[in-house]
């Protein structure tokens, strides 16, 4: 059984591209009003234009999710203009081109953790009390395959941030399920988004075509959101059928240094 999302309000971070933008499109088609957050204004404006072409309703709330005070202000803006936030999609994230222990500095590590993990927490912190007061709310944390399976390709900082995000999801359900709040850890394997452009080893077009596509994740997010309130999808682990982590290859399982 699916519920109607018509008239609900969603806050989507990382909404300027990739999974975040695909989530916006899928939810707007279901009648959801959306608040769009991200660091880059121009991509957010493009997403807003796409919403308007669908006759949807949305507003811009640009923010660096690592800035906790700015995040609270963004949430307040969305509530003031669109109503209480029913759905939070934490899709903001990044990775490093130089991601090995031998290449990273302390600042590199902290940047990944501050955006991927602390940024998600900041957004949760901004909505959780209001969801608790209403006895209802859905949080979707876009984690990663690397948040469930250790990955050489993802690197240690990204992997640590996503493992922690998956754990944060579980503890929200442990503490807040009794308050009507549901949290899902969405853990996709490789998705053909612009984050691939930061890979140390370039990804060929033929490989990108075999990967999950952003729209696959957008529709999955809509599916999660359309579950009735008594259903909590704690975790959704999703991969392409041609899963490169199962196939092997020098970028996934490198040999010893030459």
Per-range role (PLM):
Residues 178-179, 185-186, 205-247, 251:
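C-terminal helical subdomain
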Residues 99-101, 108-110:
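Substrate-binding pocket helix/loop in short-chain dehydrogenase/reductase
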Residues 41-42, 62-74, 106:
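The beta1-alpha1 cofactor-binding region of Rossmann-like NAD(H)/NADP(H)-dependent oxidoreductases
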Residues 149, 171-181:
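Active-site-adjacent segment of SDR/Rossmann-fold oxidoreductases
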Residues 9, 16-18:
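Conserved glycine-rich cofactor-binding loop
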Residues 144:
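Residue(s) in the substrate-gating loop at a strand-loop-helix junction
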